[in-house]
């Protein structure tokens, strides 16, 4: 939802715009599901929103980066959502049942988002040279955020999320699963992955890669990313613009 607040102009047809709008609608629905779980734990939704726009609450690293071209739309829907679904599937066996239940719906819908992203990418890499270059340029910018996506290589027995069975997969295992599934597909399309050190070690069955800059990840998720302030400013503006709806619909907000 956050990523698409400033949508780039469509480069294919109205169908692309409709598909992207449907994806955004799904993402809004996912946010609603998660807010309901948080409310059940005792934190009001209004407080969640206040914490978000004040900068108190953190949000995922990928939402701190700008969406510049239609190439970004494809890379986000195909690769960022692919990385996300790896993490989300690790939550299907979450020890907190209400959270595990909503993840079933979220995973099902995210699988369609990946197909949408793949279609966008296929159309562009088989289109004009300019379209191909837009995809490559977007991949170049998004690769490090993708490598940051699953977090640092903390041992599973030291990860509270794993110890408490919130998730069922260690960070590095999730990253390796993503690389296993998508590096071959990226290369098959003729795209170049911007990491000369990336290679598959046949002996270990693991991917080797340039160590991501974890200091940058920490900086980004604490509100210092390329589009962090823009995202929060837009949220504040949106909150102000719809405040009258709350006053009309909710007596306690009046």
Language-model features, listed with the residues they occupy:
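A structural signal for well-ordered alpha-helices, especially hydrophobic packing surfaces
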Residues: 1, 31, 35, 114, ...
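Long, hydrophobic, well-ordered secondary-structure blocks that form the structural core
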Residues: 9-30, 53, 107-112
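Conserved alpha-helical segments that form or flank metal/cofactor-binding pockets of metalloenzymes
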Residues: 23-52, 118-122
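Acidic/His metal-coordination segments adjacent to aromatic residues that form catalytic metal sites
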Residues: 51-77, 94, 127-128, 142-165
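Internal, conserved structured core segments that host functional sites
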Residues: 65-116
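Extended, helix-rich structural scaffolds rather than catalytic motifs
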Residues: 133-254
């Amino acid at each position: 939802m956050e990523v698409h607040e400033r949508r780039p102009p469509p480069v294919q047809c109205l169908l692309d715009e409709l598909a992207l709008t449907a994806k955004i609608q799904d993402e809004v629905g996912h946010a609603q599901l998660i807010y309901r779980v948080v409310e059940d734990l005792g934190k009001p939704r209004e407080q969640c929103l206040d914490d978000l726009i004040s900068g108190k609450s953190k949000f995922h690293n990928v939402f701190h980066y700008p969406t510049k071209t239609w190439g970004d739309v494809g890379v986000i829907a195909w690769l960022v959502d692919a990385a996300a679904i790896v993490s989300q599937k690790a939550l299907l066996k979450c020890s907190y049942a209400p959270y595990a239940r909503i993840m079933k719906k979220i995973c099902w819908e995210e699988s369609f988002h990946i197909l949408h992203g793949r279609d966008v990418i296929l159309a562009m890499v088989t289109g004009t040279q300019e379209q191909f270059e837009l995809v490559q340029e977007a991949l170049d910018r998004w690769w490090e955020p993708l490598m940051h996506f699953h977090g640092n290589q903390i041992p599973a027995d030291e990860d509270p999320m794993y110890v408490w069975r919130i998730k069922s997969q260690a960070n590095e295992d999730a990253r390796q699963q993503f690389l296993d599934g998508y590096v071959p597909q990226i290369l098959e399309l003729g795209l170049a992955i911007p990491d000369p050190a990336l290679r598959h070690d046949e002996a270990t069955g693991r991917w080797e890669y340039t160590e991501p800059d974890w200091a940058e990840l920490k900086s980004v998720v604490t509100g210092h990313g390329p589009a962090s302030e823009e995202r929060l400013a837009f949220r504040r503006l949106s909150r102000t613009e719809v405040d009258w709806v709350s006053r009309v619909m909710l007596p306690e907000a009046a």
